[in-house]
Amino acid sequence: MAIAAGGSKAARFAGRKGDALIVTEPRAELTEAFVSAGGSGPRYAEVAMCYAQRKEDAQKTAHQYFRWSVTGWPVMAELPDTDSFAAASWHVSPETVAQVVSCGPSPERHLEAINRYVQAGYDHIILVQVGPHQGEFLDFFERKLASALRDRKVP
């Protein structure tokens, strides 16, 4: 069983009781806590990104669909419904969302975001395209990202 962790305590629990770790932030201390507690299984990272032909459009989409992601797990875990998520993130700008969601048409930008997780010790990467433009992202992935990732040409 894979266990999601947003903090060291949960990562240690995943190391003791789970078969794998899942995270959404490139924090090396979570992999360290998982391993120090006996975890030897895969370490999965969900990497949020938003592809669009223009960086500004990607930021706008990420803001519309994923602005709550900047609040972090300690806040998100306490929010009971969608209205609460909206209230907790009403002040978040598209530029702020772009600090946690890789946005735009640049393969290098997305590869850098992925590499932060690889450098933090995650060995399985889950790409999450934010917003409704899944087909465009899949085309971009096929043309620009897949070979670099498969060849481990992550900067």
What function would you assign to each model-found segment?
Residues 1-155:
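Active-site-adjacent structural elements that line small-molecule/cofactor binding pockets in enzymes
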